[in-house]
Amino acid sequence: MPISKTLPYNAIEQIKSYLLQLQNTICVSLESIDGKTRFHEDSWQRAAGGGGKTRIMANGNVFEKAGVNFSHVSGEQLPASASAHREELAGRHFSALGVSLVIHPQNPYVPTTHANVRFFVAEKEDSEPVWWFGGGFDLTPYYGFVEDCEHWHQTALNACLPFGETIYPKFKRWCDDYFFIKHRNEARGIGGLFFDDYNEISFDHSFELMRSIGDHFILAYEPIVARRKDIPFGNREKAFQNYRRGRYAEFNLVYDRGTLFGLQSGGRTESILMSLPPIVHWEYNWHPEKGSDEEKLYTDFLPAKDWLKKE
C-alpha cells in the first residue's frame, strides 16, 4: 500500500511551530557567539495576507549584520517566480511559510552564510492541494580553508543520510548549479545543500527532511566561526571581503528565487532585502595578485568539487 501524500489538516500549524522554534534557536546561538549585540525583532503584517517576524543584528563583535526572518504569507494567486513552470498552479490561492537567514561577519576570515527552509501549498476548491518543501544552506568564504569546507559538507551529508544515500549528492549538485553567477562565470561560494519542489513519499517524510536540514545549519556554521573569528586582519582583507560581497549582492538581486518571489508577491521589502551586505565595493576589472590568498579563492575553492572525497 503506497504511503499517502495527503496534507494533514494541521500541516500549517506544525510547520509554523517548527519554523518559529528554529528561528529562536538560531538567534540564541548567534547571540551567544557574538557576545555583544542582541537581535532586534520587527513584527510585520502583509496587507494581502499574512506577516512575519524579522530579527536583525548589526555591528556586533563577530557579526557585522545578521538577519533571521520568519514569514507566513498567503494570497489568491502565486507570483510568476513560483508558478512559471507549473501550469497546475494557475488559479490557486497559496500559503508560503519559511525561515530565511543571511549572516555577514566582521572578520573576512569568517565566511558569509545563507540558509533557508520553506513550505508552499497551493489550494483550489474540489482539488487536492499541491504542496512542497524547499531550502538548504550554503557557505561563501572570502579566504578558504579546506578543513572548513570539509566540515561544512560533512555536516550537510549528516543532515541528509537518514533519508538515503542519494539525497546529499543530489542536493549538493543542485546547490552548486543554483548558486552560480552566470554573468561572472563563477560560483558564489563553496555550496552546501539546495532543494525545491520536494514532496517525496509522504508529508511526514518530507517535513522530517526539511527539519533535519534546518537543525544542522548551526552545527555546520558555529565551529567555523569559532575557528576564524579571532584571526587578525587588515585593510587588504577587508577590502577583498567588500569586493566579494558585490558578487553576493549581484546574485541576490538578479537570480535568487526567494528575492524574486518576495518582491513579486508583494512581500515586505525591508525583510526581503535584509540579505544584502551592509558595505559593498565594486572595482572595475579587478583581478587578484598571482599566488595570493585572494587568487586561491578563485582557483582552489570556488570551482565545484567533492569536498568529502578521500584521496
UniProtKB/Swiss-Prot annotation:
Principal location listed in the UniProt entry: cytoplasm
Source superkingdom: Bacteria
The keyword Oxidoreductase belongs to this UniProt entry's keyword annotation: yes
Pathway: Porphyrin-containing compound metabolism; protoporphyrin-IX biosynthesis; protoporphyrinogen-IX from coproporphyrinogen-III (O2 route): step 1/1
Keywords: Cytoplasm, Heme biosynthesis, Metal-binding, Oxidoreductase, Porphyrin biosynthesis
Any one GO BP annotation for this protein: protoporphyrinogen IX biosynthetic process
Site (Important for dimerization): H183
Presence of keyword Cytoplasm: yes
Location of the protein in the cell: Cytoplasm
Residues where substrate binds: S100, N116, V117, R118, G266, G267, R268
Cofactor(s) needed for function: a divalent metal cation
Entry EC no(s): 1.3.3.3
GO CC annotations on file: cytoplasm
Record Gene3D superfamilies: Coproporphyrinogen III oxidase, aerobic (3.40.1500.10)
Region (Important for dimerization): 248-283
Reaction(s) this enzyme catalyzes, per UniProt: coproporphyrinogen III + O2 + 2 H(+) = protoporphyrinogen IX + 2 CO2 + 2 H2O
A molecular function (GO) term: protein homodimerization activity
Residues at the active site: H114 (proton donor)
Family: Belongs to the aerobic coproporphyrinogen-III oxidase family.
UniProt subunit comment: Homodimer.
Job description of the protein: Involved in the heme biosynthesis. Catalyzes the aerobic oxidative decarboxylation of propionate groups of rings A and B of coproporphyrinogen-III to yield the vinyl groups in protoporphyrinogen-IX.
Protein name in UniProt: Oxygen-dependent coproporphyrinogen-III oxidase
Natural source organism: Legionella pneumophila subsp. pneumophila (strain Philadelphia 1 / ATCC 33152 / DSM 7513)
